[in-house]
Amino acid sequence: MSSTRLIPGVRLFQIRNISVSLAEIPFNILRLSFKKNKSDEIIIQNNSDKPPELVKHKSKSKFERCIDNDKDILLVLPRYDGNKKRSVVDIVQLKDFNVIHTYEHDITSMNNQINIYNSEYENLRVDDSEIRFEYRHPLILNDGTLVSHGESSPLFKIDVCSNLIWINQDERFHHSIELSNDNSIWVPSSMYPYSTIVGNYIDEIGFFDDAITKVSQDGEILFIKSVSEILIENKIKDLKLLDVYDPIHLNDIQPAKFDSSYWKKNDLFLSLPRVNEIVYYRPSTNKVINFIQGPFSWQHDVDITSDYEISIFNNNNSLTDKNHSEILIYNFETKKFSKKFNKSLVENNFKTSTEGLSEILDDGSMLVEEQNH
């Protein structure tokens, strides 16, 4: 009689992949019934696969005004339009909540230009079909063009009339999209093939080799560096970091737009929620200058708010005192944390488990997004 045992310390990627394949059998059966045209292009999905019509919030207003607001500010709002059964991006004027423009490009046409024979995108025409696709972290540029992705998907750019300009499918892009000082774009990606250190340690598919990626406005990758490599090369972590399939989960890259006593222009602040750290990194020298740990967990959205402070969106998924999310301010002079508008956030039962954004405006007020309460 033979027996099977699990050996401590061995990375069980193959077992995990087999388990995932078994779990996906019902979904793969469902895929077979998706409607296609003569070119084998998916055009619509089953009626049974469409999202249910939401009636719970039909009587509620889209926005609620709590105080008078005469700020001349525009909000870039990606949302799912239940009537159109697709994702759109609205440009909303906050002083009166009027939608002054909407982006909604042809998702099916874009998907048909993507190489589905690439293992990273073989299910894209199903997973990111028009009825499922979501615009993530759209960035509006000065000429009205929009750069976005669908989360772990190609990066793309459309014009103000929603015409597709370019697609980059070299990597899978995810989370934040930020403008650099030279008008390039910083965006997280997942590298495959893996970076050198990761590739020498792992040969199975399924590891998330998250990287900082700089993309030109023409869609070309100018710079890419694995965050796992950064941490290992700077001796902050060792190879044991790679024993977890998603050790980093990079969700924000914040470039420094100016010099200060505490950072240099073009330095980067990286949010790494899996290890509950903000890493201060200098790409020009491949050096981690500092890494910040503190009273935050599963954080999102690090922003530079002054010449000596950064804000951190603390999702606050700790084992204790986790009822509300917080916006923390870290002071580089005092090396201490404080909370921004915490009383108001608690009064409004502010909590988002794994997502969310915040923006501190020039007048000191703050805009927060509660994404999954």
Question: Language-model segments: what does each one mean?
Answer:
Residues 1-373:
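Histidine-/acidic-rich catalytic cores in large beta-rich domains
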